[in-house]
Amino acid sequence: MRANLFVTAAFLVTLGPCELPSSPGDTDRLTFEILEGYWVDQPPSPQIVLRLATANEYSCMNYWIESELTVADRTLRVDMTGRITIGEICLTAMGPAQYKTALPITEGSYALVFARGGLTDRYTLTVTEAAFEITTVEAHFTRPAADRFPRGG
């Protein structure tokens, strides 16, 4: 009986709850990519999507980087609070905290701006028929996963 109690207690301790990260510093290193496909909601046609991810892995796959996209002319601005949030349930799989949003863009050049806690990162995003190309202007806390992302993949 005592052994069963010990095994049960050890199992519960190992499982652990889905908890929020202990500090806002968990979003210090963010990687982003531009993708084309059915990434957010699946409308009739593919979308161009910005996906940000933390370097840290979390015990639930539905942690989110608290952020908001604003679009003005040819500027795409993502304002981040630095907080990581989670819904009411834990989707039990390991993964980074993420932010995904559809971008209302077509071919051409855009300013891509990330702002968080007084820091601003700036990139130029060039959309062509074949690819999404990223040029770094100024970077403090973000970095592209690549300088070029092929379309449709």
What positions do the PLM features span?
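Compositionally biased low-complexity segments at domain edges in trafficked proteins
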Residues: 137-153
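Sec-dependent bacterial lipoprotein signal peptides
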Residues: 1-16
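Bacterial Sec-dependent N-terminal signal peptides
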Residues: 13-33
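Contiguous segments within soluble domain cores/interaction surfaces
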Residues: 54-88
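Contiguous beta-strand segments within globular domains
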Residues: 40-62
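Short acidic/polar inter-strand loop motif in beta-rich domains
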Residues: 84-89, 116-124
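An anionic, turn-rich surface loop/hairpin at beta-sheet edges
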Residues: 80-105
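A short tyrosine-centered beta-strand micro-motif
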Residues: 106-117
